[in-house]
Amino acid sequence: GKPICGETCFKGKCYTPGCTCSYPVCKKN
């Protein structure tokens, strides 16, 4: 399945591949 970008981003970094930080959560790149 595709990664879900819903984690909170810390210092502009997202742990899920293909996601970017749109504070305060990660969004699909």
From Swiss-Prot:
One of this protein's Pfam families, by short name? Cyclotide
Concerning PTM, the database record says:
This is a cyclic peptide.
User: InterPro entries from the xrefs?
Assistant: Cyclotide, Cyclotide_sf
Q: Name one GO biological process term.
A: defense response
Q: Where is this cross-link: Cyclopeptide (Gly-Asn)?
A: 1-29
Q: Which cysteines are joined by disulfide bonds?
A: 5-19, 9-21, 14-26
**Which protein, by its recorded name, is this?**
Cyclotide mden-C
